[in-house]
C-alpha cells in the first residue's frame, strides 16, 4: 500500500484559484466553484471554515463549513453546514475527504461549534460520525428534501451535551441579499 502525505491548511484569499480548480475538477462543472466563491465572501456564512488539502504542493481537496442558525432565532448556538466537500478525481478513494472532514470537525470544536449538518451520501458521511435523518430529530433542512432522501440530511454533535434546542435550520444564501435563508 502506498502512503500519501497530504497537508491541510485553513484557506485565505491567496488560495482562491486553487479552491476554484479543485471544485471545478471534482464536480465537473463550475457551479459549485461559483457557490463556494460567493459563500466565502458572504457575511451570513461567517464564521466559515475553509480547508484545502495538498499533495506535494498541488491542491487536491477542499471542504467548506458555513454558519447555520435556527430560522427566526437571533441568538442561535454556533452551528455549521458542511458543503461542499470536493476531491479531484485522481485523489478520490485515498482518504483525503475523510481527513478533510476530521480536520474540519476538530477546528470547529475549537471554535465552539456545537453541531454540524450535511446533506450528503447516506453511506459515506455516517462513517465520519454523522447521524442520518436530522429532520426526524427536530432539525428540518433549510430546503425541501424528498422523503426517500431524508436519511441524507445528517448531523453530528460536537459537544458532550447534545443540543436541547430544536428548530428549522437556516443556511447562508449568497444568491439572495446576503441574509440567511
From Swiss-Prot:
InterPro entries: Acyl_CoA_acyltransferase, GNAT_dom. Its EC number is 2.3.1.-. PROSITE patterns: GNAT. The keyword Protein transport does not apply. The keyword Cytoplasm does not apply. One of its GO terms (molecular function) is acyltransferase activity, transferring groups other than amino-acyl groups. It is an enzyme of class 2 (transferase). This is Uncharacterized N-acetyltransferase YjhQ. It comes from Escherichia coli (strain K12).
Amino acid at each position: 500500500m502506498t502512503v500519501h502525505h497530504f497537508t491541510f491548511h485553513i484557506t485565505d484569499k491567496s488560495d482562491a484559484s486553487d479552491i476554484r480548480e479543485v471544485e471545478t475538477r471534482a464536480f465537473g462543472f463550475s457551479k459549485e466553484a461559483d457557490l463556494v466563491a460567493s459563500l466565502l465572501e458572504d457575511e451570513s456564512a461567517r464564521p466559515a471554515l475553509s480547508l484545502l488539502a495538498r499533495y506535494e504542493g498541488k491542491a487536491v481537496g477542499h471542504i467548506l463549513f458555513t454558519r447555520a442558525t435556527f430560522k427566526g432565532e437571533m441568538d442561535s448556538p454556533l452551528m455549521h453546514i458542511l458543503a461542499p466537500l470536493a476531491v479531484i478525481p485522481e485523489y478520490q478513494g485515498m482518504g483525503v475527504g475523510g481527513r478533510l472532514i476530521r480536520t474540519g470537525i476538530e477546528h470547529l470544536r475549537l471554535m465552539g461549534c456545537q453541531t454540524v449538518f450535511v446533506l450528503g451520501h447516506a453511506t459515506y458521511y455516517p462513517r465520519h460520525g454523522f447521524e442520518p435523518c436530522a429532520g426526524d430529530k427536530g432539525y428540518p433542512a433549510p430546503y425541501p428534501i424528498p422523503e426517500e432522501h431524508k436519511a441524507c440530511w445528517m448531523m453530528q454533535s460536537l459537544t458532550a451535551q447534545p443540543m436541547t434546542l430544536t428548530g428549522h435550520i437556516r443556511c447562508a444564501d449568497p444568491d439572495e441579499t446576503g441574509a440567511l435563508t
